[in-house]
Amino acid sequence: MSKPSSRSSSDPQNNALLVVAMLAMVAVPAGIALHTVQIPAPTQIPPADATPYGYTVSLLLFIVPIIVIGWWFVPQEGIKIPKQAFWRTISLLFIAGCALDYFFANRFFTYRNPAATLRIPAPALGGPVPIEEYVFYLTGFIAVLLIYVWLDEYWLLAYNVPDYPAEAKKLRRLLQFHPTSLVLGLALIGLAIAYKKFVSHSPGFPGYFTLLVAGGIVPAVSFFPSARPVINWRALSLTLFIILLVSLFWEATLAVPYGWWGYQQQQMMGLFIGAWAGLPIEAVCVWIAVTYATVIVFEVIKLWQASERPLKDAFLGAREVPSRKTQAAGN
């Protein structure tokens, strides 16, 4: 039996493109099939008590994997999670998630079924939101990162980068501009604006999609060249598919049909999936952006810690001190 080529298993750029191709080979035919639904099946507005505490209980979709991986799989196999990098990543992302939820939750979402929650209000601009919103983001980030780490350190260990200090020493600085990510992000936002204006003909601006692209692209624009060689792309792709499966089940069959949360149409691109209770395409994109950004941030923090350099020097590069010989030549 022939062995896989070294390029297919070791070229980070090729692996990144393969992840995109894997996602596209599922998304494109699925999108074509869903587009054939010209007249969505009629839906009935359920009574308020149709799903008591539904949103609250559904958080188990994140909590159970966290418990199973964190308290069973990891200890059983003796996996050593880089705890400092893990919790620093979660802290950064959760703070960012809370800030976005505080400022934009009422702009992008609706919550018309309070009976599906504990009815505990959490602060947000424009009015309180269910406390479940903040728990949703916290457990979501932890679940995404824990799944990736478990796959990276155990299930797909063969594709792990074991020598982080060596990789870290190759980098003069972690902060490296990646123009391709910037161009791609601007192109996606431009396409969303054009679609909303010329195809969907719906009023408003695709603010939610713009925010998602920015959230996923900013880490890539800043750190992708540094993170690309150390990302376990197979672990990332499997994490992405697992999270997408969970989120689509969650939103398309439960959250949107039963009003746990909904979407402000003026802030959406205008591309809605009729077969999935009018779910906007942004609901599919959000966890792609979250998974991608989470992994990049985590790997960059691991590289920083492995470099054993101060924060400023690691991210911006140490300023070279001129030698006496160089100074003499200058004089």
Model-identified regions with their sequence ranges:
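Aromatic-rich, lipid-facing transmembrane alpha helices and their immediate juxtamembrane interface loops
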Residues: S2-N331
